[in-house]
């Protein structure tokens, strides 16, 4: 979803041959997934959305992003520069993309899924009749990993978007080992959960919380 939102926002950049005029209603509907024009048709009416996942469903933070989307639409198209910007220099695409990477993806990863691991059940399969042989804890761990990357063999693959992409950038991987350390912690924790060792998994939760904070801070400083 965020990939298509970003593509739509960038269509208003002045560097394009024919910069588009953004429609605020379209951006807002993409955010809450009432939108039906997705290029990826699997996103249509799939019951998932970015808005409800933003900052643990904080209405104030959601309103902030919606305000940026309205402002981006009002400012479009940008015919004076390469990027869609406010008079103060704020680049709307970056504010929305990077903001949601933090308020949605990083938040869901750490403050939602990993934060609940200690109380998750790890003894009963979720729904064997439906082919869901994993436990609640295994499922939530995998959900957290999915907010980092969708590639099981990261960082061999899965370095093309969002946190999986930025963690593997030289300024993060070479300096603080973000891609390697986060990948290792996720794998180590998942193995511990499958082995029934919750205490060992919680050690990896602590490592991941620290590593994600460092990754976000390092990206912001860069």
Where do the PLM segments sit?
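Mature extracytoplasmic or organellar-lumen-exposed domains after removal of signal/transit peptides
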Residues: 1-222
